Amino acid sequence: IPERKLTHEELVRAIRLNIAAEHEAIFLYMAHAEATDHPLVKEVLIDIANEERVHIGEFERLLEILTGDEDRYVAEGREEVDEMAEEMTAAEQAEAPEMGGEEITIGSLKD
């Protein structure tokens, strides 16, 4: 049992760390899912990764409540990206590389 409770600032910092950990878990689970051909394992790993995404939403909502201004900064960032996207011409958007093209793999993990 800890000797003291977290201060408000420490709690906010801890929640930010929790969000980072959830992102790391998603990366790890998705990497494992992409590295296997086993359908059940792939499905379970993707499901778990999606659960981590829900956790991120829960932690982000807590940050909004605790900080009182987190949503303002998130909204500002979204607006900046939307403005950049609007400024791109159709030709520029067409030239952008497509995601999910030819897959590069590490080869067999058995060999």
Where are these regions (language model features)?
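Iron-associated oxidoreductase/ferritin-like identity signal
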Residues: 1-111
